[in-house]
Each structure stands twice: as C-alpha cells, then as structure tokens.
Amino acid sequence: MGSSTNNTQSKATPSVLENEVNSSKSSVVSSTSSAKGLLRETTNHGTMETSSVQISESESRPSKMVLVLTLASSISGFMFGYDTGYISSALVQIGTDLSNKILTSGEKEFITSATSLGALLGAVVGGVLANLIGRRRVLLGSNIIFVVGTIIQLAARTVWTMIAGRFVLGWGVGIASLIAPLMISELAPAKYRGRLIVTNVIFITGGQLIAYFINWGLTRVSHGWRVSVGLCMVPPVLQFVLFWFLPDTPRFYVMNGNFEKARQVLRKVHVDPSDEFVNATIDEMIASDSTVPGNGPLQKAWKSIKIIHTTPGNFRALILACGLQGIQQFTGFNSLMYFSATIFETIGFHNATAVSIIIAATNFVFTGIAICIIDKVGRRRILLVGMPCMCISLIVCAVAFHYLNVDFSTGTVVSRGINGWGIVVIIGMILYVASYAIGIGNAAWVGVELFSDVNVRSIGAMYAACTNWAGSLVIASTFLTMLENITPTGTFSFFAGLCFIAFFFVYFLLPDTAGLELEETTDFLSNGFNVKQAAQLSKERKKHSKFAKSKPTV
C-alpha cells in the first residue's frame, strides 16, 4: 500500500510543480522544501523507497544517445589534449621559423601560457553564457573560436603572431573544457557518472598521445610543426557538425521551463525509462531549480554568483571543486606536458619527442584504468593513495636531477645520450604521471557534480575551470624560469611539498559522493563537509544497490 501511494504521488508531483513554477514563487519554494525533505529522509535513513534513487538504480542505464553525447562532448577534451601535446614538441621543432631566431625560455613560456590566459577568460564567459543560451550553443561557439585561433597560428611568422593565435585558441579551449564535463555530469546516470566524465579525460590524454606521435613522425620534415598545428582544426569541425544535430541537457530545458523537451531528452538518454522515473527525475530537477531573482540575463548571472557564495552547501561545493582543480595544476603535471620535450632534450636524449611519448602513453593507459575503478573505489580513496605516490615520485626526480648536474640556464649537460640518472628521471616521471592519471587527473574533473542547484552549476563549473586555467597560466609562465633559478632539484622538491599539503586537503575535506544523485550533493554539504557521514552513506547505498540487484522482480 505504502509503495503504491508513493508511486501515485511521484506521478502527480511533476505536473503540480510545473503549475506552481508558472503561477507563483512561493509555491516553488514550498515544493522545493518538500523535495529537499524527501532527499534528507533518504540521506538520514538510507532508504530508497520514497525517492527516485531506487528507480535510478534499476532504470538509469546509459543509452546509446547518452554515449553519443558523451563522446561528442569529449571531443573538447581531445582538443585540449592535442593542444598540450603538440606545443611541447613544437617548442623544440620551431627552430628559427618565428622571427628568424631560436626561441628563448621566456618566449617559450609566453607562447605556452598564452593559451592558458585565453582559456581563463574563455571559462569566465562560458560559465555565464551556459545558463543564458545553453550548453550546446556555447560549445558550438567554442568550435568556431578554436578554428580561428588555429588559422592565426598557421599564418604566424613572428613570435607575437604565434602568441596571439594561441591566445585566441585558448578562448575556445577554456569554454570547451568547462562545458564538456558540465554536460556529461548533467546527462549521466549517477551510477555511471564518474566513468562517463573520465571519458572526457581519456580523450584529453588520447589527444596528447596522438599529438606526440604526429610530431615524432614530422621531426625530420621541414616546418613539420605547422602540419601538426593545422590538424588542430579537425576536432572542432567534427564536434560542430555532431552537436548541430544533438540536443542540450534536460536540466537546461528545465531551467527555461521547457519541461516537455526535458522529458523527451530524458527518454532518449535512458534505456526504456518508465513514466514514473521520468516524472520523478523532472520533479527533482524542478525542486533543485531555485528561482534566481533579477530582470536581465546579466543580473541573474550576478545573483547566481551571490547565491553560490552565500548558500553553505554551494560554497562548500565551490571550495572542493576549486580545490581539486588547484591541486591538479599546482602539483606540477602540466609543466611536464608542456615542457617534457624541452626537459628530455636538455638532460641529453637525442630524440626528446620520442621519449615524451612514453610519458603521454603512461597518462593515457592509467586514465583508462581509472575509468574501470573510479566509481567502484571512490574518488576519495583513490586520491588518498595517489597523492603520496606523486610526492614520492617527485622526490625521486629531484634526487636524480641533483646528480645529473644539469644547468637549464645554458642548456648544457654532462654527457649526451642515455645515462643512469637520466633513466631514473624517466622512471620517476612515469610513476608520477601514473599516480596523477589514476587520481587527481580524473577526480578534479568530476568536481562539477558537487553542485546540485542547477542555477549555480555552470557558475560553479566556471569557477573550477578558472582555477584550473589560472594554475595552468602560472605553471606555464614560470616553470622554465624556476628550472633556471632554483634548479630542477629545487623545482621538483617544491611540487613534492605541494603534493604533501594537498593530501591533507583531501583527507580532511573531501567526502565520498559516490552513489549520491546530482540533486542531493549540495543538500548533503549544507551543514558541513561530512566526510565520515559520506563514507557511511556510500556503504549503505552499495548495500541497497546489491540488494536491489539480487531481489527478484514481481
């Protein structure tokens, strides 16, 4: 009887909520409070009988449509990865092609960091526009910007033209890096969300690996680096064509009051969902869609920014999302990806690009492993193992550089070719990259799922992406200078120290949100970070999930 009553209520609620949304703000507040009470009951008692969590466990398998949308969105990751990979080798291969002289360390830093600066600004604009015109349209715009930036680089004959091209391209990269994980998090069922978001990271690492292989093949080709730059135009053109025919996310349609379109997309992204499941899911989205006051789009965007800072649950989610992105950047990984070829060339390897492929391949393989374990093991546990491993690996590299006696200010080495300490550097970097790829390299990108309020999610994703690109800007513009001024040993020791500090951030503040619905997370963070409670809830959810699978259907 109780179950039947609940089902009837679930079916009725969406239509009632829609009428309330259209008629009065007070009714929405009442409905939202009711829905949050329902979620709170689920959190406190571990029961799944009165919410759509039970339904999502049994029905929310990813459909072919959600896989297509995930793959299409992840092309953004490929563009980001390809850009990171090709510039590492291009900095070695450019020679005197720009301004008729060899690039200085400062010019290399300017060329590399220009993309990060553009991406930082692009992420700000993309975060605001995502709520105003939709995730899909913003992504289409980023594709056009990406192509324009690539054309400017192809035509570059001076260092500053190259810098300008990479700055423009950075706008496209920044917007795309924000929108891709946002779209995937809003489309993916909770059970598969981590794995599907990591698909975007797989595309990032795949783009890096392919760029290294292409540059390796073009090593002896005159002006071959321009060919690898030109190939940058292929992914954005492909993504533009795909998304021209694909829909936006259900949550964006709910934000704009287009409930029927949201239902249509939900039916496409789930395998044969029942009306009860679709209605309950729309109900949760409407309940979490707190009305943002304001007359114009910019005023509403400003109100969203105020809400994310003044609502405790949203603000804690913001701390975690930005903290994870900051850890990802300031532990030094992108310094290796941007300048690995420069490092290997300086420590004596004849074909630095070929050696860099080892690093990119390690990143790709261990990101694939992360897909298999991230939802089963949990982000928190992976990070608590990965961060110490990164720290130890960086210390190994610091010791090896001490005995290599490399002077990065002049680029001189003791001997040319393979030597013992050079091999130790490679081993240390491989271990570091493996630990990064399986941990913070993936966990940072799932931080957007911590924002359950749909009105602030794109703003939260914007903050997280801005943190990422601000960190990338600092790393790209200072890494070679650090190698020259505080030595490689000092530089790698510095990053090891940051890894050590990051471990305690994760240990004390990051809860395990595995199994929580997207609409539950901010409510869960409303009265604290709840690290212990999250661990207990995760265990209870797994028990319920196993019980639901083993229980025969009637």
Swiss-Prot record:
Glycan attachment sites: N6, N22, N279, N351
Membrane topology: Multi-pass membrane protein
The protein's name: Myo-inositol transporter 1
Listed Low complexity bias regions: 15-34
Organism: Candida albicans (strain SC5314 / ATCC MYA-2876) (Yeast)
Known role: Major transporter for myo-inositol.
The gene coding this protein: ITR1
Domain of life: Eukaryota
Keywords: Cell membrane, Glycoprotein, Membrane, Transmembrane, Transmembrane helix, Transport
MF (Gene Ontology): myo-inositol transmembrane transporter activity; myo-inositol:proton symporter activity
NCBIfam families: SP (TIGR00879)
Similarity comment: Belongs to the major facilitator superfamily. Sugar transporter (TC 2.A.1.1) family.
A GO BP entry: myo-inositol transport
Gene3D superfamilies xrefs: MFS general substrate transporter like domains (1.20.1250.20)
Annotated region (Disordered), positions in chain: 1-57
Keyword presence, Transmembrane: yes
Segments crossing the lipid bilayer: 65-85, 110-130, 144-164, 167-187, 196-216, 227-247, 313-332, 354-374, 382-402, 420-440, 459-479, 490-510
Compartments in which it is found: Cell membrane
Listed Polar residues bias regions: 1-13, 44-57
InterPro entries: MFS_dom (IPR020846), MFS_sugar_transport-like (IPR005828), MFS_trans_sf (IPR036259), Myo-inositol_Transporter (IPR050814), Sugar/inositol_transpt (IPR003663), Sugar_transporter_CS (IPR005829)
